[in-house]
Each structure stands twice: as structure tokens, then as C-alpha cells.
Amino acid sequence: MSHLAELVASAKAAINEASDVAALDNVRVEYLGKKGHLTLQMTTLRELPPEERPAAGAVINEAKEQVQQALNARKADLEGAALNARLAAETIDVSLPGRRIENGGLHPVTRTIDRIESFFGELGFTVATGPEIEDDYHNFDALNIPGHHPARADHDTFWFDATRLLRTQTSGVQIRTMENQQPPIRIIAPGRVYRNDYDQTHTPMFHQMEGLIVDKNISFTNLKGTLHDFLNNFFEEDLQVRFRPSYFPFTEPSAEVDVMGKNGKWLEVLGCGMVHPNVLRNVGIDPEVYSGFAFGMGMERLTMLRYGVTDLRAFFENDLRFLKQFK
């Protein structure tokens, strides 16, 4: 009891010297723990007469309360200082430039499709779509390719069963459009098509764009003029273009279209022709009254020519080093 004031003073001095919450807790244990200096003072009460014990106990409790208040105050100071230090370390300099948000980019094939749709949209063409799981009638028969026709063997078709398949061309969209719409018709049909082939210039899935006009007095001259303007627009230069006689079951006459490359060699870019009368009859359009032309082109092929890509498979490998070149 005689040393009580000294213990309180010693405790307060130790509290003020504590540099962090952990050191402060050590002081608390030293003075107020089960075996702490002030706690042990309570054991001296047994040495006093009974009538003096309550007053002495009150003095000890008052001393313990002083130390506890000092502990609480110091703890609040230390926690406040720690919080301020952490906030200072985490201060954001609002004058610094913000983090740049990376912009995505369109896939080069998508760029090609959008560019072609934009050009033909200005000529009054609308975009038509159709199912990728097709029946053999719309994919072959209606296009003047009956079951015995050798052209079927050239398509490397993915069949589900005897009549259902993954479409090998977007021409089926033309058939479905003509079945449901009377001339005049002016459409383009972009979409995915599938053939069982894979090498440097072929993939099992690729993109095609087909175009179709059906109206009165449509001629091959109209076809040539339309495609010539399109190619000059797409490649952004005045190209030397040639139409080479070819064969497609669904057009007559038919032609392959080539452009002169920078290396002085002809490059094949698309196929075209006048819609075969049998195709018009198959959809209930009188070929004596109406005529039309159609064309088809591979989107990957045109993209390769436009950007100088040599391996078709690069479009499908999702290599960001390749794709970022087109942002």
C-alpha cells in the first residue's frame, strides 16, 4: 500500500514510453494482469484490520482505474497515429494521370464484313441471314445441284443425317429469301459456312458473303459494274479487274473475278454469274420475266489480300500479337 503512488507513476511512465499497441499491452499485463503489480496489492488487504479493508480496497481500485484510463488514452493515440500513417502511405495524388482503359478492336474478318455491308448498303442492299444447320434441298437441290451432281462431292460436307447438314455455302439464304419475297430483291448474305478441310488456305469453318439481285432487265453488264465498283472501294485503289469464264451450277453464265496484284500476277477474289433459270423456277419466279445476278466471296480470302496475311489459320488462333495489328 505504501508504494501505490509509485506504482501508478511507474505505470504511467511505461505507458507513455510504449511505442505501439503491442508494447502497450505488455505494460497492461505487467500492472493490471493476474499477477500484475497493482493486482497483487489486493493481496495485502488481508494484513489490515477488517474495518480498514474497504477503504484500502477503494484506494487500490482508484489506482488501477487511473492506470486503465492512461492505457485507454495512450491506445487511442497510438491507433490514431497508425491510422494516419497508413492513410498517408495510401494517399492518392489526384494530379497524376488516370489509368488508361484499353480499347478493344474488331477482328480483321469482322472489319471486312462491316466494310462490305457498308458499301452494298449504300447501293440499297439489305442484309439477310439464314440457318447454319441446313437441309439438303436449300443447300443443294434448289441451287440446281441434285443428288447425282458431281459438284456435291466437291463440298466436303458435314452431314448430321441423310437430309440435314452444316451449310457449305450461304446460297441457301438466297433461296429462302426468294421463296418468301417477290422481286425486286437486293440482298447480301454474310455468315459462317462449314467444309471438312483444314490446311494453310482452308479451315473447317469460314465466312462467306453472297449477294443477289433479282429484277427485270438485269444483265451481266450490271454485274460487272457493281463488282468493279466494289473491288475498287474495298481495296481503295483503281484495280485492273478481269472476269474469267467459269462454271457454277446455280449461275449461267458464270465467271471468276481476278484482280491484278502488286506482284504483277492475277489474284482470284470471288465468283459470280447470272442466276440460273432453274434456280428461279425452283422458287416460283418466272425466268422469262425476271433475271438476276449473284456473287459470292470468302471473307477470310479478301481479308488476307487486303492486309497481306499469308496463313488463313491466323484468323482463328486468337494470338493477340496478331490481332492487335488491326486495332
UniProtKB/Swiss-Prot annotation:
Name of protein: Phenylalanine--tRNA ligase alpha subunit
EC code(s) of this entry: 6.1.1.20
Reactions accelerated catalytically: tRNA(Phe) + L-phenylalanine + ATP = L-phenylalanyl-tRNA(Phe) + AMP + diphosphate + H(+)
Family: Belongs to the class-II aminoacyl-tRNA synthetase family. Phe-tRNA synthetase alpha subunit type 1 subfamily.
GO biological process: phenylalanyl-tRNA aminoacylation
Subunit note: Tetramer of two alpha and two beta subunits.
Subcellular location: Cytoplasm
Binding site for Mg(2+): 252
Textual note on the cofactor: Binds 2 magnesium ions per tetramer.
Cofactor: Mg(2+)
InterPro entries cross-referenced by the UniProt entry: aa-tRNA-synth_II, aa-tRNA-synth_II/BPL/LPL, Phe-tRNA-synth_IIc_asu, Phe-tRNA_ligase_II_N, Phe_tRNA_ligase_alpha1_bac, Phenylalanyl-tRNA_Synthase, tRNA-bd_arm
Gene Ontology cellular-component terms listed: cytoplasm
Origin: domain of life: Bacteria
Metal-binding is among the record's keywords: yes
The keyword ATP-binding is assigned to this record: yes
Keywords: Aminoacyl-tRNA synthetase, ATP-binding, Cytoplasm, Ligase, Magnesium, Metal-binding, Nucleotide-binding, Protein biosynthesis
Enzyme class, first EC level, given as a word: ligase
GO molecular function: ATP binding; magnesium ion binding; phenylalanine-tRNA ligase activity; tRNA binding
Organism: Klebsiella pneumoniae (strain 342)
